[in-house]
Curated annotation (Swiss-Prot):
Entry protein name: UDP-N-acetylenolpyruvoylglucosamine reductase
InterPro entries: FAD-bd_PCMH (IPR016166), FAD-bd_PCMH-like_sf (IPR036318), FAD-bd_PCMH_sub1 (IPR016167), FAD-bd_PCMH_sub2 (IPR016169), MurB (IPR003170), MurB_C (IPR011601), MurB_C_sf (IPR036635), Oxid_FAD_bind_N (IPR006094)
Entry's Gene Ontology molecular function annotations: FAD binding; UDP-N-acetylmuramate dehydrogenase activity
PROSITE patterns: FAD_PCMH
Enzyme class: oxidoreductase
GO CC, alphabetical: cytosol
Protein role: Cell wall formation.
Gene of this entry: murB
GO biological process, one term: regulation of cell shape
Cofactor(s) recorded in Swiss-Prot or TrEMBL: FAD
């Protein structure tokens, strides 16, 4: 049993007995399908439970990690010491005139579909992004010339001391794959998007077109975390990797996708170690050839295997 067993009952008091898992394999909770066990994994069902869980962790010096859909996450093979707070059950979405308000765990696809039903445009670019809205805002996710920064109005967040407050668009300070949320280690609880009225068919056709392009160009048939690397200034990561001759390069079960060099995929039976070794190999080779540093877009957490 792990060192946090003494807190199991306290977490169960907060989130309920059925929402606390012990030594939970993180490969069940990430799109890469890899990762060792988390000491505890809890799934709060209300924002108040999130706040109480964070305060319990803070007061007892328990490390904690927030995850949504696990789609931009790589957990090392040794797993996670401490508590994973998964926002899976915090997915409420409501539409108020031209605004869509969503809890942090709501999948982007669900939010896009609610906007579509209400003839609200602006989020079409996000419909194929597999993550939840909390993670999307934290990293200012984007695709096909669209970014969260273009449509967000505000975000309700919580800090490490359990204080809840609202950040407007300016305070969120959204840049390329960055935000004030990352900088100050805030956690997103709820997001308000301001959209525009549009025709149902116009929105639907745009979504279908972007999803068709994704399917044609991206290795969606394999586990991955989407684009592995951020776009280096003045370059495209996929082109640098391809021009280095690394398309199809494998280490263990991890491979640089033959369909899109910007994706590292789990071809089958990969470990987190395989993926991390391949990431480092690609970074080194691209640096040698082009003197360009590739930085990961995927979030990497957890312990190495002993």
């Amino acid at each position: 049993m792990n060192q946090y067993k003494n807190f199991i009952m306290q977490f169960e008091d907060i989130v309920g007995n059925n929402n606390v898992l012990i030594d939970e394999p993180m490969k069940k909770h990430t799109s890469f399908k890899v990762g060792g066990p988390a000491d505890l994994l809890i799934t709060p069902t209300t924002l108040e439970q999130v706040k109480d869980s964070i305060i319990l962790c803070r007061n007892n010096s328990i490390p904690y990690y927030i995850i949504g859909n696990g789609s931009n996450l790589l957990v090392r093979d040794g797993g996670i010491r401490g508590v994973v707070i998964k926002f899976l059950k915090l997915g409420d979405i409501k539409v108020e005139v031209d605004r869509v308000i969503a809890q942090s765990g709501a999948p982007l696809t669900n939010i896009c579909n609610e906007a579509l039903k209400s003839n609200l445009g602006g989020l079409e670019f996000a419909c194929g992004i597999p993550g939840s809205v909390g993670g999307a805002v934290t990293m200012n996710a984007g695709a096909y010339n669209g970014e969260i920064s273009q449509v967000i109005e505000s975000a309700k967040v919580i800090d490490k001391d359990g204080n809840v407050f609202l950040l407007n668009k300016e305070q969120l300070d959204l840049g390329y794959r960055m935000s004030a949320i990352q900088k100050y280690h805030y956690i997103v609880l709820e997001v308000t998007f301001k959209l525009h009225n549009s025709e149902y068919d116009t929105i639907k056709n745009r979504i279908m077109d972007l999803n068709r392009r994704r399917t044609e160009k991206q290795p969606l048939e394999y586990p991955s975390a989407g684009s592995t690397f951020k776009r280096p200034e003045g370059h495209f990561a996929a082109k640098l990797i391809e021009d280095t001759g690394l398309k199809g390069k494998s280490i263990g079960g991890a491979q640089v996708s033959e369909k899109h060099s910007g994706f590292i995929i789990n071809k089958g039976g990969a470990t987190a170690g395989d993926i991390l070794n391949l990431i480092e190999f690609v970074q080194n080779k691209v640096k040698e050839k082009f003197q360009v540093d590739l930085h990961t877009e995927v979030r990497i957490i957890g312990e190495e295997n002993n």
